[in-house]
Amino acid sequence: MSLRQDSGKNFLNYSKFILPVGAAAVLATVLGVGWYTQPDRFARGYQPEQPIPYSHRLHAGTLRIPCLYCHSGAPKSPQAGIPSVEKCLNCHRVTKTESPSIKMLAAFYTSGKPLLWNRIHTLPDHVYFDHRPHVNAGILCQTCHGEVQTMEVVYQNMSMRMSNCLGCHRSPGNALPTASASAKGPEHCYACHR
């Protein structure tokens, strides 16, 4: 056997076995490290501290203020939106005005500085989500955000991973009591990855 034939066999072994196995190992390592090091804001249970204490249990639960009163952007824009200080003061100009939290709220309003709430439900930058079709189809906020009306301090109830979205898109009956095949959400990549 000549040297030329021998080196050809080694190349075949390399390209048919070692190269694919090596590429798979590198890919698995990259995906594993990416999964493991994913920031907390994408994980279930994420509960950042907020600049002013706010009880969803009181407002959405006991007082039964609808989600869309404060998060009015949900039915008409991609983002649900965080209420402005002015929205809070619609009630708190006359209600609980001596509360330390309400005094802090009023101080933000007087100073003209924005109140920067820490976002709880966040998606990676490469994911596009539009609240409009979900809210307008009658999907309850609790489907993705959990029973917020029972939470003193809101936390991320479920992981905001693609598998959760696809679960509803493929079987909308879990989210929509009267779902039909036409109510299924799109499953193609561009629907969410833009």
Locate the predicted segments by residue.
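Aromatic-capped interface at the extracytoplasmic side
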Residues: 30-48
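N-terminal Lys/Arg-rich, disordered targeting/topogenic segments
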Residues: 1-12
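Alpha-helix-centered segments that form part of catalytic cores
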Residues: 111-131, 135
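Glycine-rich, flexible loop/turn motifs
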Residues: 38, 48-50, 113, 125
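Amphipathic alpha-helical "stem/stalk" segments
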Residues: 106-109
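Hydrophobic membrane-insertion alpha-helices, especially the h-region
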Residues: 16-34
